[in-house]
Amino acid sequence: MSVAASRRAGSGFFRCPFHLSWRTLAPILVCTWSLAVSVQVFGGEPAPAILGVLDGEVKVIPPEGGVAKPASNGMTVTVGTRVQTGKKSTALVTFLDGSTLTVQPESDVTIKQADVGKKRSHVIVGVNVGTVWARVVKLVDPESTFSLQSNTATATVHDGLIGARQEPDNTFTCWTRAGDLWVLEPTGRARAILKPGQMDIVKAGAPSNPQAFFSNHSALRVETPVSVLPVILMPDRVRMAGFTDPDTDVNHVFGSYTGIDGEGQRVVEVPAGVSGPFTLILQGEQDGPFLIRIGALYKGVPVDQHQVSGTLQRGARLAAQLTLQLEGMTNDAKTAKVSGVMIGPLESTDLQLPGKVGVPENP
């Protein structure tokens, strides 16, 4: 096996990331957390979602109310359940249609509606406070919706990658990386329709003002041919974004992007305000040579770009450490400016991704 790397300059290296190719999967395998867990089903009817603890301690309040209790990894959650995260904890809610909701630290959400089916789904998540990130699968029925709701607005998408943040002062911010996002007022009137890469801030007395969205100013981006499955494991070695099989992508990283571009290339982009190291894992879907692209971006503009080539056999895996070079000294990951990416050698690996959870087929 041979691996070679080269560096390229110029802003035309990366292509527009906003073309998605989602496929409905039922049952679906979703890569989630560090232990394989079984889904609990009561009364013969599968609950609409399961809850995973990605990091720290997560608490739940059942629909009937009461005191918040520690959540268990893989427990079912039903309509009316509240999920709460602490300062250093992150939760993942996986719905039976394959859509996922990542609940960021210091957040509180309520599952208000979860009518989930093979061809049609209607999900509403109330964001009481904090930040959430959702990967919404595309279903056959064009009427299917996934909504993030606050007291002041509802952000609704058919499929894509969306997020929202609810502040204690009732300010509601929502954004989309993929998929048109409808921002509706409580009356049902459309306040705005956000295009991929846009955000809007809903605040009392302020008009809609869509603007560019960056979860972090800096980003790490990988492009591969369709014959190679890329996954980026974050420095915490818990969260990841990428492709775990030809038709399944996972996206647990707030502000990240996973999809297929207009030229059929697999694309993974994650926020990168820390040096890392990030771990890139490549899995072959067929025998033969490959050429991948790795680069760093600042506010959406490429600042460092590399090409890496090699050979890969079907089912084999290669891994490399990616370390980002940051300008100046800053403790703010959101505004840190990346200047380059250092790529370690691609080597054979038996490193396993952080576990899998099987979601039972929805009747």
Language model features with spans:
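Extracellular glycoprotein-like low-complexity segments
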Residues: P207-P363
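Bacterial N-terminal signal peptides
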Residues: L25-V37
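N-terminal secretory signal peptides that target proteins for export/translocation
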Residues: M1-W22
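Flexible, surface-exposed loop/linker segments and immediately adjacent secondary-structure boundaries
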Residues: G43-A212
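The N-terminal extracellular segments of secreted preproproteins, especially immediately downstream
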Residues: F13-R15, V30, T173
